[in-house]
Regions:
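Interhelical loop/hinge segments that connect adjacent transmembrane helices in multipass membrane
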Residues: 1-4, 116, 172-182, 192-235, ...
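Signature of the first transmembrane helix
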Residues: 3-62, 100, 127, 163, ...
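Interfacial transmembrane-helix starts/ends
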Residues: 5, 43, 75-89, 218, ...
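Membrane-interface junctions at transmembrane-helix termini in multi-pass inner-membrane proteins
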Residues: 5, 130-153
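Short membrane-interface helical motifs at transmembrane helix boundaries
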Residues: 28-31, 94-113
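Membrane-interface helix-loop junctions in multi-pass transport and translocation proteins
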Residues: 31-39, 144-149, 160-192
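Alpha-helical transmembrane segments of multi-pass membrane proteins
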Residues: 51, 97, 112-134, 184, ...
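Helix-loop junctions and terminal segments of transmembrane helices
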Residues: 57-72, 143, 257, 262-299
Length: 300
């Protein structure tokens, strides 16, 4: 069994198991243990973090997959990956400055329909940053064709931690407010685990490395931000917009419907985790026959 078939099957199983946990959370635990208001708030925060993620990552997760095959020596590969750890700071730092200086204005604007959002607005850039760097570290392992553990963290572990937290609300170990704050801890822990996995596979180097393709990398990442932001908005902008026009409880109802519809995309989502880096490598090496074969195999 080839690496595509093997990891696609593993990722598909992981994704379906993760969706099973997600179904229990979305259809039962959120609605019964957390309540409509805080379920809607949670969906708003996670959707907003998902919208910010491409900006916070500055397209680095896709840039890593595209450009990694171009570096031939182990030193160059390690240097490139280390460089990409700091590359997103080009956009992160200006964004954080804007959040700092215009915090009150932005928070008041976003919470005009649902005042509850104001007290939790500080979580948005943090969640976006954590989600962004999770994807950077996930891309780090994908280019080494080891996508399964990252899929486990993303699809199963996060949902299990949320499930445990929701049950803690039910037995009064946590309040609903504490649960919402705990989202930062859950996504922070997931990002740290992904970082450990990435560094276990290939350690960063303590040396400044500026790739000669810097200009091309910068331009590509800028375009990826546009496409990535559009893709993220198509997935998450609806829940964000609902919170701006109607009561936040409606975000909870809508999230249940969206989750049910998302099950259809599971096989494609799982296969993409391994086919994306393989496609990038074949294109970088001009292996068009192998690329043609890969397209045929994955379209079946």
């Amino acid at each position: 069994m080839g690496i595509v078939s093997k990891q696609s099957i593993q990722n598909t199983l992981i994704t379906y198991v993760g969706f099973s946990f997600g179904a229990v959370n979305a259809l039962f635990l959120y609605t019964h243990f957390l309540g409509e208001t805080y379920y809607g708030l949670t969906a708003f925060l996670l959707s907003s973090g998902g919208i910010l993620m491409p900006l916070m990552a500055f397209g680095a997760h896709n840039t890593i997959i595209k450009y990694f095959p171009l570096f031939k020596t182990e030193q160059e590969k390690s240097g490139f990956l280390t460089f990409m750890l700091f590359f997103p700071l080009i956009l992160i730092l200006p964004l954080l400055v804007l959040f700092f200086f215009f915090y009150t204005d932005i928070a008041l604007y976003l919470s005009r329909e649902n005042p509850i959002i104001y007290d939790f607005f500080w979580m948005l850039p943090i969640l976006g940053l954590l989600m962004g760097y999770f994807e950077v570290f996930y891309a780090w392992v994908k280019v080494h064709f080891q996508s399964v553990f990252g899929g486990f963290i993303k699809e199963i572990l996060i949902r299990v931690m949320i499930m445990i937290s929701l049950y803690s609300v039910h037995i009064h170990w946590l309040t609903s407010v504490q649960f919402v704050f705990l989202l930062v801890v859950i996504y922070g822990l997931s990002t740290v685990l992904m970082m450990i996995s990435a560094f276990w596979i290939r350690k960063p180097i303590a040396k400044i490395f500026i790739p000669k393709e810097f200009k091309a990398i910068f331009v590509y990442s800028a375009f990826i931000i546009l496409s990535g932001s559009v893709a993220a908005m198509l997935i998450d902008i609806d829940r964000f917009m609902i919170s701006q026009f109607v009561k936040i409880e409606n975000v909870a109802y809508y999230s249940v419907a969206v989750f049910i519809a998302a099950v259809v995309a599971v096989p494609s989502r799982a296969m993409h985790q391994i086919t994306h880096p393989i496609t990038a490598r074949l294109m970088a090496n001009n292996q068009h026959d192998e690329l043609n074969m890969l397209y045929k195999q994955t379209s079946i």
